[in-house]
Amino acid sequence: MTTVNAPEFVRHPKLIAWVEEIANLTKPAKIEWCDGSEEEYQRLIDLMIANGTMQKLNQEKHPGSYLANSDPSDVARVEDRTYICSQNKEDAGATNNWEDPAVMREKLNGLFEGSMKGRTMYVVPFSMGPLGSHIAHIGIELTDSPYVAVSMRKMARMGKAVYDVLGTDGEFVPCVHTVGTPLAEGQKDVAWPCNPEKYIVHYPETREIWSFGSGYGGNALLGKKCLALRIASVMGREQGWLAEHMLILGVTNPQGEKHYIAAAFPSACGKTNFAMLIPPAGYEGWKIETVGDDIAWIKPGEDGRLYAINPEAGFFGVAPGTNTKTNPNCMATLHKDVIYTNVAVTDDGQVWWEGLSKEVPANLTNWKGQPHVNGEKAAHPNARFTVAAGQCPSIDADWENPAGVPISAFIFGGRRADTVPLVSEAFDWVDGVYKAATMGSETTAAAVGQQGIVRRDPFAMLPFAGYNMADYFDHWLNLGAKVSEKAEASGNKLPKIFNVNWFRRDAEGNFVWPGFGQNMRVLEWIIDRCEGRANAVETPIGFVPTYEDLNWEGTEFTKEQFDLITNQDKDQWVTEIESHTELFNKLGERLPKALKERQAALLEAVKLASN
């Protein structure tokens, strides 16, 4: 039997008993209690270099940075192997995979039995959210992957201090992770152990996460999507708060007024770029600061305002497409102490990925560790960087404020070649929830005259809601109604809700809106709408700006171009609203009646409008 040997700084009997229980099941060769120290980090990095999991990069160009190359079969989240095992199938809903918890436990017990043989079990304590914040939650991950242990040190507040907050009886979310490849005595390990059979399992009632077979990102760093979205969304519903797939940014105008915005976009729609936006020419005196680029936990305050924290402490960003033009702040964040995964590397130890530079460097080794061949991808399309958020030059002074930052507006956006205008403001909270619930994003780049397939991704939470999506909509509606009463009593208002679409195309299939820093122009209008300063025109689908309502200083973007990305085609909108029925039917009878009513009213308004 493996000796548990809990260190003195762990004073939580229930936690120690749980570690012992999992050790008896998984049978690791030894147990290490992580303390989050620099010495421990370096020791684990050196261990992985010796194992061939990691390589040291050029320390002049990339100080303190390392590269890991995963197994080619283990490169992304596995949505089809991700389960929400609630007691009742209906509580998981139609958009999640479900299995009876008793059946799943039996299955996983078989898989986890002896799964850590020959390996070290790392006990990784972490806080999602600033230590001690009333919005934060603690997790403990038991993993046999040193890659997970070092990555969690960057992605969460990881180490000894977590045990001080936990004390002798504090609550924690138990997370168990194994790569699922036990080692027999004397057997040589592979550089990236993983198992073809994978399970990422959540038990919402008992707040447990079990992950088997993958060493990669969101499947293995269990504080990220598993805890911070799937389990936290269940907690939020029970306790009256929100766990959302949203960036948080701060906007300060030249007069010193500051607003915080939370924005939800599906993957590959530019969340990180938007969170780290640099205002363009013509916006001197404006400042954008980053609180978070991926996840927001939002709790109502006594004053009826919604306060958000970024539960993470790092960025786990997609590398391809990131460069000094698209995201200079992100590139500056990567100046040191980065763990790269599945990017390419030059013969002198510098990283490279598609979009980093126009020229492909000579003598490149691709993400599979082979010489790069032109015409193939050098970096995997989902190649990642893991880096501490505190290194970001645009990081907000209040990014670790335990009370959170007050949200003035929510933005929802997807990738649509037509139909959806550049920006629109919802009529009210219910209308905003309807728009977020029915938002869609194209899965394929739209060819000329051919629309990409629109996948509905409600609130950009389709892969991440830990319970029935219809109940999730209901939670947003109820929270709005409750908070609205408090807000009115304190002289505050609910955040306004906006929809954006940076991706409208012209007849030739080209993007019309320049995006990136130019999105500041839309952001300014949104802020001014929150302040009651900006004009808008009422249309059947929401309030929209005219060309004159936006600030065009420093750009030559024409009224004709603006009209192209803001026009509302009546037939397209009738088709669009009618297509929402497919999602609503899928979600079944728990769908809030208010959303069905909103759909009928919208459809009628659009049909009555002149084109």
From Swiss-Prot:
Top enzyme category: lyase
CDD domains for the chain: PEPCK_GTP
Compartment(s) where it occurs, according to its Swiss-Prot or TrEMBL record: Cytoplasm
Any single Gene Ontology cellular-component annotation: cytosol
Note on how the cofactor is bound: Binds 1 Mn(2+) ion per subunit.
Keywords: Cytoplasm, Decarboxylase, Gluconeogenesis, GTP-binding, Lyase, Manganese, Metal-binding, Nucleotide-binding
Recorded superkingdom: Bacteria
Binding site for GTP: A268, C269, G270, K271, T272, N273, R384, R415, F516, G517, Q518, N519
Binding site for Mn(2+): K225, H245, D294
Cofactor(s) demanded: Mn(2+)
GO biological process: cellular response to glucose stimulus; gluconeogenesis; glycerol biosynthetic process from pyruvate; oxaloacetate metabolic process; propionate catabolic process; response to lipid; response to starvation
GO molecular-function term, one example from the UniProt record: manganese ion binding
Main location: cytoplasm
Gene3D superfamilies, per database record: 3.90.228.20, Phosphoenolpyruvate Carboxykinase, domain 1, Phosphoenolpyruvate Carboxykinase, domain 2
Transmembrane feature ranges: none
Function, in words: Catalyzes the conversion of oxaloacetate (OAA) to phosphoenolpyruvate (PEP), the rate-limiting step in the metabolic pathway that produces glucose from lactate and other precursors derived from the citric acid cycle.
Cited HAMAP family: PEPCK_GTP (MF_00452)
Sequence similarity: Belongs to the phosphoenolpyruvate carboxykinase [GTP] family.
Name this polypeptide is given: Phosphoenolpyruvate carboxykinase [GTP]
